[in-house]
């Protein structure tokens, strides 16, 4: 490095490529690109301006929390300089997958205005003002809205892409692997070249960011190992400030250094792995050099890189929840002031003569003024929409008071609402709801106006805070119509596994975007042969084996789905879903919701469950996933033909989903359809498997066969059971098929293989609460479930742990005996 008064130059030699590094110019010399980075006085002072703005935003943000304007604040102060350097290595089409510390890099890439920064801090529930999360995430969670207002994809190659940040520490890592893996697929699978809005020949790299304490999480280590195995362009920055809130690194990390702890993954001349670089958070020149080098290795060589950014400071501690003076001694606090990256950068500028002290103070003062102005604008706009509602509510309550017997109470409500200096949306709604209580014995035009206002306001707030749990686009899988399976007059009867395999073959033949991955999926075609022979036909790059790492299998799928591919990833057995549950519930299930329709990841998770053998190969934890994975569709096919039809439906839609295939159905014979890949099972529409008049049994999955067999035995004694296969738990019975059946039979039993109160409890709530079916019952509803323990091993263990034919028969008989004891005496 050579220093001059006006310019700082350094050189990097790169292989010839089609991309143009950002933000500097590139020239061609003898088939070699020479990247000539010229940092002018103007560049340097622009960087100084940005770090001053970012720091001031952090300081004012904390002040607003302490002053009551915002509920909570967490900021990126102390990391400004490293993020400036990272931004200079970013190119359009690249991705950032991070957490709540990255405000400076987002601002450097023009993805953040400071007004939007404060709008998010205040919780402004409007995409126009908080385009990142529409007030649904706390502050410092950033999003590139890669979906248009109709939910359709926009180009990802002409923007700097930020995947909506996560607060659960380490949660951003699994999807980072998938985002980087997508670049590998786009680079090596030429059949994807037409998807130019998603990739330019796989030249995109992924910048993941994580705090040093969060590197203790298992998903971080799983991601690092998988990235090194897969050799994907993942550039991970670890912001190391030496603490996890109050817990020092000595309690967190082996050797008190994540770069030392990861040294075994360092690549060598003979062994692939990852590149590990270290740099100080306050060293401007070294940061620039390190990030340019890291990005070059990552982009050109397709090698993962970890940049361990050391000696990061926390000027305000972890968050607004408390002061770091509680757990840092005076020497540490003094060191943090001395090594503050903004202070060091200022001194470096002065030492090298790029500006005078007066010039830097002028920049600092201008930054403070700008941040104050944008913060005040954000607050004013935030309050305006709320105060409009406040005034509307006050006016309507006072109007109602003029003719009401409860006038004093109503006027007090209006006066209390008027005195709210910094009201929230809830305040007007609360006041109107209380007013309507007071008016419950009266009828008037003003009461009707209050009621009308409340209903309109409820719809507005439903959109503000509860929309986009599922797709609202034209591609919603709920809009995919049913297409029946077609058969020969004498169809071939094959194992169920052959039906789903043939269907996957048809799908992969017709859509190059499809990718399947998971343990044993590739070479042997999965443990139940649903992909047998398909890797050989469609290639290893499309049907791929993975290690035993459920969390990053899901992460790979999320990243691929975000980048325009259609992955089907496998959790080998349903019991193993717990390994991946955090990533499923925190990231995948919430992505569309927490961006208010700005981002989606239409991933399909394939697994198999219900009953086979033993504690960990026969689980059916449906309540766990139903209550953890709102935002996904949960499909529970009774056989492999139904499963195939569900895959066909889901691949025509744009929501994520979990499909639980019946584990004991792969070798049962099924008719092979003719229209493979085309027949569709609609979501949320149960199927009546057997007509009856005496009672309705609602079930799904492998239990369908059990219940059907019991129904035949019950018919022999004069009990006719109507059997309904719900087919999907999310969504559940959209057309109220179950209600129609109960109106006929007046009795209902809910049966599944989950533990007591699990899936049966969910179905009971849906039918009794949502469908109000209780009005049609002549007998109390009953449930049939597995025992409260995990299923025991062996056929005997299955029989005494899971519901069986005799259980279904006897509980149904008890129901009939209670109703007609003479006809059905107790057994």
Describe each region flagged by the PLM.
Residues 80-84, 160-431, 533, 663-827, ...:
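Thiamine diphosphate
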Residues 599, 609-613, 617, 622, ...:
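Active-site phosphate/pyrophosphate-binding segments
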Residues 56-237, 242-244, 248-266, 271, ...:
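Cofactor-binding active-site loop characterized by glycine-rich and histidine/acidic residues
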Residues 284-304, 357-359, 579-580, 591-594, ...:
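Phosphate/diphosphate-binding loops
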Residues 99-100, 176, 209-210, 236-240, ...:
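Short beta-strand segments
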Residues 4-82, 88-89, 315-317, 321-538, ...:
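Conserved acidic/glycine
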């Amino acid at each position: 490095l050579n220093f001059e008064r006006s310019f700082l130059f350094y050189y990097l030699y790169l292989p010839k490529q089609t991309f143009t590094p950002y933000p500097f110019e590139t020239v061609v010399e003898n088939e070699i690109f020479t990247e000539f980075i010229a940092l002018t006085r103007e560049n340097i002072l622009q960087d100084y301006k940005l770090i001053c703005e970012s720091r001031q935003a952090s300081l004012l943000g904390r002040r607003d929390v302490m002053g009551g304007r915002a509920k909570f604040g967490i900021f990126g102060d102390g990391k400004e300089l490293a993020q400036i350097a990272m931004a200079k290595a970013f190119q359009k089409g690249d991705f950032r997958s991070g957490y709540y510390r990255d405000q400076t890099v987002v601002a450097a890439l023009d993805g953040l205005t400071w007004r939007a920064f404060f709008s998010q801090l205040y919780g402004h529930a409007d995409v126009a003002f908080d385009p990142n999360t529409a007030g649904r995430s706390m502050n410092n969670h950033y999003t590139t809205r890669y979906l248009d207002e109709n939910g359709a994809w926009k180009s990802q190659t002409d923007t700097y892409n930020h995947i909506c940040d996560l607060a659960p520490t380490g949660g951003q890592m699994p999807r980072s692997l998938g985002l980087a893996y997508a670049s590998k697929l786009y680079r090596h699978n030429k059949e994807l070249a037409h998807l130019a809005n998603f990739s330019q020949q796989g030249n995109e790299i992924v910048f993941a960011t994580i705090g040093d304490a969060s590197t203790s999480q298992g998903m971080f280590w799983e991601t690092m190992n998988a990235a090194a195995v897969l050799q994907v362009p993942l550039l991970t920055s670890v912001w190391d400030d030496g603490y996890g809130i109050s817990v020092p690194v000595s309690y967190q990390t082996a050797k008190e250094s994540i770069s030392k702890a990861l040294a075994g993954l360092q690549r060598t001349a003979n062994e692939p792995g990852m590149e590990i670089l270290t740099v100080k958070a306050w060293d401007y020149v070294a940061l620039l050099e390190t990030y340019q080098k890291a990005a070059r290795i990552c982009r050109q060589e397709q090698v993962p890189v970890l940049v361990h950014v050391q000696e990061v400071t926390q000027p305000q501690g972890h968050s607004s929840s408390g002061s770091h003076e509680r757990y840092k001694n005076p020497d540490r606090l003094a060191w943090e002031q001395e090594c503050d990256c903004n202070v060091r950068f200022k001194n470096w500028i002065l030492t090298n003569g790029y500006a005078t002290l007066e010039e830097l103070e002028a920049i600092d003062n201008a930054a403070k003024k700008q941040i104050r102005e944008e913060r005040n604008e954000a607050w004013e706009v935030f309050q305006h929409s709320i105060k409009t509602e406040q005034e509307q509510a006050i006016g309507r309550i006072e109007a109602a008071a003029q003719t009401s017997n409860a006038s004093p109470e109503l006027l007090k409500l209006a006066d209390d609402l008027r005195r709210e200096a910094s009201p929230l949306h809830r305040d007007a709604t609360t006041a109107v709801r209380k007013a309507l209580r007071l008016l419950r014995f009266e009828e008037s035009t003003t009461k009707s106006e209050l009621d009308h206002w409340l209903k309109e306001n409820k719809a507005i707030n439903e959109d503000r805070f509860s929309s986009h749990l599922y797709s609202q686009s034209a591609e919603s899988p709920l809009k995919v119509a049913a297409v029946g399976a077609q058969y020969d007059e004498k169809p071939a009867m094959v194992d169920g596994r052959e039906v789903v395999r043939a269907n996957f073959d048809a799908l992969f033949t017709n859509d190059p975007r499809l990718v399947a991955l998971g343990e044993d999926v590739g070479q042997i075609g999965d443990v139940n042969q649903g992909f047998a022979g398909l890797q050989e036909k469609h290639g290893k790059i499309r049907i791929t084996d993975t290690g035993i790492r459920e969390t990053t299998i899901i992460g790979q799928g999320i990243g691929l789905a975000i980048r325009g591919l259609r992955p089907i990833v496998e959790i080998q057995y349903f019991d193993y879903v717990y390994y991946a549950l955090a990533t499923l519930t925190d990231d995948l299930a919430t992505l569309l919701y927490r961006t208010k329709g700005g981002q989606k990841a239409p991933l399909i998770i394939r697994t198999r469950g219900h009953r086979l053998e033993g504690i960990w190969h026969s689980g059916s934890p449906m309540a766990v996933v139903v209550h953890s994975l709102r935002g996904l569709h949960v499909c529970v096919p009774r056989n492999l033909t139904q499963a195939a039809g569900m895959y066909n439906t889901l691949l025509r839609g744009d929501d994520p989903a979990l499909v639980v295939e019946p584990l004991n159905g792969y070798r049962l014979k099924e008719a092979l359809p003719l229209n493979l890949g085309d027949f569709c099972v609609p979501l949320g529409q149960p199927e009546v498997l057997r007509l009856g008049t005496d009672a309705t049994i609602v079930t799904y999955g492998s239990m369908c066969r059990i219940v059907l067999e019991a129904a035949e035995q019950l018919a022999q004694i004069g009990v006719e059971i109507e059997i309904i296969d719900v087919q999907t738990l999310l969504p559940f019975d959209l057309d109220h098929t179950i209600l129609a059946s109960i109106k006929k039979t007046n009795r209902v039993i809910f049966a599944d293989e989950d533990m007591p109160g699990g899936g049966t409890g969910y179905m009971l709530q849906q039918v009794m609460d949502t469908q109000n079916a209780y009005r049609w019952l002549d007998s109390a509803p009953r449930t049939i479930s597995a025992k409260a323990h995990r299923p025991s091993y062996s056929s005997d263990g299955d029989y005494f742990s899971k519901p069986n034919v005799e259980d279904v028969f006897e509980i149904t008989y008890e129901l009939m005996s209670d109703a007609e004891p003479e006809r059905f005496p107790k057994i």
